[in-house]
Design a protein with these regions (language model features):
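Structured catalytic core of nucleotide-sugar glycosyltransferases
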Residues: 1-133, 325
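Hydrophobic helical membrane-anchoring modules
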Residues: 2-7, 145, 182-327
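Alpha-helical structural elements of signaling/regulatory helical domains
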Residues: 16, 38, 175-179, 229-233
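Short, flexible helix/strand-to-coil boundary loops that buttress conserved ligand/catalytic motifs
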Residues: 25, 174, 297
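Acceptor/aglycone-binding surface of glycosyltransferases and processive sugar-polymer synthases
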Residues: 73-75, 79-89, 94, 105-183, ...
């Protein structure tokens, strides 16, 4: 009797990827068949309420290939919740996350699997260079370095989530019940010994990126509030510093006025500058405080990671989404 093959799960999140959905499916399928012939596989698409033909294309793929599964979200649940939810609904011996836009090279799959077979529970791709906009790459690099210095956890530079995760770590993700998960931080904080494989990130194959300044800022704030205390510490120390400087300057002005009562004219300019400066500082740190409170509120509300609209090619005994809560 032949030994049962290990199963590689490939999770592909999509949002308005009508030009890439079928090509990424074919590329992943062909790569596994060619370079990982001793493994079985499943491909799971999780679609974040696409507004184009993506869902129709994925539905056609599922009808043609029983190894392909799909989860259609009832709305857009964001760039972190949806992929995380897809990961915890894979069933393979390992799960590989890969973007539909081809910026995560499918040629990395056999390299990931080879390192996994050596015993690594997590094998990740780490960008060394990128063919994307050099300004964006520079800003991302600054972000990674900044968050690494400020974080309580040793964060991973140039890591987007692209990688292979053993089923034991996938179970860890299921057990976390985090309603606002930040996978990159979770891997750094809770992941076992990992292998990092460097790669060059290619350009998006087709279509337009869905990351804008707001989504990038949202990602930065999630990592900032989840893994650093620096915002609150900065507010405390800077507030103390401003109070000390204001007290000293106040004494200087008072002494100068007492000594040169008739000739010293302080005027309103210093006062106005000081008021605007302190007001700006207060508003900045109130914003920081608000980010922390929003992060806490999201966790306290205990809402589901995702609410499903539909799923395709799942076995009947697979748990339904509305019972999968981030508790």
């Amino acid at each position: 009797m032949s030994e049962k093959k290990k199963v590689i799960s490939v999770m592909i999140p999509t949002y308005n990827e009508e030009e890439n959905a079928r090509p990424i499916y074919e590329a992943v399928r062909d790569e596994i068949r060619k370079d990982c012939p001793d493994y079985d596989y499943e491909i799971l698409f999780i679609d974040n309420k696409s507004q184009d033909r993506t869902r129709r294309i994925i539905t056609d793929i599922c009808a043609q290939d029983s190894k392909v599964k799909a989860i259609f979200n009832s709305k857009n649940f964001g760039q972190f919740n949806s992929p995380y939810y897809g990961m915890i609904h894979t069933t393979g011996d390992c799960t590989i996350t890969i973007c539909a836009d081809f910026q995560d090279p499918v040629e990395m799959i056999p390299k990931f699997v080879a390192e996994w077979e050596k015993g690594y529970k997590i094998v990740i791709g780490k960008k060394t260079t990128s063919q994307e906009n050099p300004v964006m790459y520079f800003l991302r690099d600054c972000y990674y370095k900044t968050i690494k210095k400020m974080s309580n956890v040793e964060m991973i530079e140039q890591f987007t989530g692209f990688g292979l995760y053993d089923k034991s770590f996938i179970q860890t993700l299921r057990d976390l019940h985090d309603p606002t998960p930040f996978l990159r931080g979770i891997v750094a904080e809770l992941g076992p010994e990992r292998k990092e494989i460097e790669y060059t990130q290619p350009k998006r194959r087709a279509g337009k990126t869905h990351n804008n300044w707001y989504s990038l800022f949202d990602a930065a704030m999630l990592s900032f509030t989840s893994y650093t205390k620096i915002g609150m510490r900065m507010a405390e120390f800077f507030g103390f510093f401003c109070a000390a400087v204001s007290f000293i300057l106040g004494l200087v002005f008072l002494v100068a006025k007492l000594i040169h009562w008739n000739t010293f004219a302080a005027g309103y300019a210093p006062m106005i500058i000081a008021v605007f400066f302190v007001g700006g500082v207060q508003l900045t740190f109130l914003g920081f405080l608000g980010e922390y409170i929003m992060a806490m509120n999201a966790r306290i509300m205990d809402r589901p990671l995702v609410v499903e609209e539909k799923r395709l090619n799942f076995e009947p005994e697979t748990p339904e989404s509305d019972t999968t809560r981030a508790q």
